[in-house]
Amino acid sequence: MKMTTIKQTIMIVTDAWYPQVNGVVRTLSQTREELIRLGYDVFMLTPEGFNTIACPTYPEIRLSLLPASKVAHLIRTVSPDFLHIATEGPLGLAARNFATRNAVKFTTAYHTRFPEYIHSRTRIPLSVTYSFLRWFHKPSTALLAPTKTVFNDLSYQDIGNPALWPRGVDLHHFSPATRRKKNPKPIFIYVGRVAVEKNLSDFLDLELEGEKWVVGDGPALAHLKSKYDDVVFFGMKTRDELPAFYRQADVFVFPSKTDTFGLVLLEAMACGLPVAAFPVTGPIDVVGDSDGGVLDNDLAIACQKALKKPRGKVRAYAETFSWDNASRIFLSHLVPSQVPADYGVFDNPYKDNTSLPLKY
C-alpha cells in the first residue's frame, strides 16, 4: 500500500503583493517558489479579494479596508501549519491580532526601514513609529531581519526577537551573458523605485564622465525628469528586460540610505555589474569590502573606483547568494502554529465549517 505524504501548509500574510513591483514582493514571490519546490503548500494572504484604497504616499500599495473578519475566516479555513506575517499593514495587523487573541504562534519580518520611511514623507517622529514596531512584533516568536546590521538595529531598539533571514538572487536569470556595449563612455545606472526615500538626487547631482540612466517608476519621476535633462529615464521595465540594462551599464549606483537590503544590488552584481553606494545599512551587508563594488561617503569616488572592478570577480561574489539557502533559513525560523498543548482539536481557533474558495 502506497503511503501518501501530507504536505504542510505555510500561510504568508502580506500587504505588499502584485501588481506592486518592489523588493518585498520579489522576496516573498521567490521565497514562495522555493518553498513549493521544497514540498510545502504556500497560501498567500494578500490584498487581492479585499476592498482597498491607495496608500496616501505610495499609491501602488493597496491598503485593505476593515479586513479583520475576513482575515480571521481565512486563517481558520486554511488552518496553516505555520503562520508568517510579512508586513505591518492592515492585513498584517489583522492577522497579528487574531493570532494573539487565539494563542496562535507566528513569525514576522522587517523588510523596510519603516520609521525612517514614514518620517521622510510625513515628519512623524521616529519615536512614534518605533513604539508601534515594538508593540507589533513583541508577540512574534522571531522577527526576521535581512542583514546583520538590521538585526543589530532591531536589537538596539528593543524590537521583537530578531533572527537573520538573508536574501538570494536568481543566478540563471541575472547573468553576465554576452555584453554588447554600444556606448564607449561609462554608463552609470540606477534601477528601482523613483521616490524621495531613494535619495536619487545624490546620484543625479554628481559630475560624472559618461551617461546616467534611471530605470524605474514612482512618484518622483516627473519632478526628476524636469530637473535633470541630461539623464536618460527609461521608466518601468519588466524583470525579463532588466538583465540587458545591467549588462549594458558600467556601474550600478545605489544612493539610498533607508533600504534594509536592496535586492537590486544582487541582481546587478549577478550580471557582473559593480556597485557604488554609501556605507549604510543594506550596502554594508550586501557589498561591504568585497569584490562586488565600492562603498564611500563620497559617492563620486565610489563610482570612479567601481569602474575598475573586474566584472568576473563581481559575478563570482554574487554567486555566494542563494535563494535555496535563504528559503531554508526562513523555514528554520518557523514555529508550528497549532500546538496541541495550547488547545485541543475541538477548540482549535483555526477550524471553521464555512467553505470558502481558496487560492494557493
Enumerate the predicted regions with their spans.
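Donor nucleotide-sugar binding/catalytic pocket of nucleotide-sugar-dependent glycosyltransferases
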Residues: S131-A177
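Nucleotide-activated donor-binding/catalytic signature segment of Leloir-type glycosyltransferases, i.e.
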Residues: A222-D240
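Aromatic "clamp/platform" in nucleotide-sugar-dependent glycosyltransferases that forms part
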Residues: K257
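Short hydrophobic beta-strand element within catalytic cores of glycosyltransferases
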Residues: P274-A277
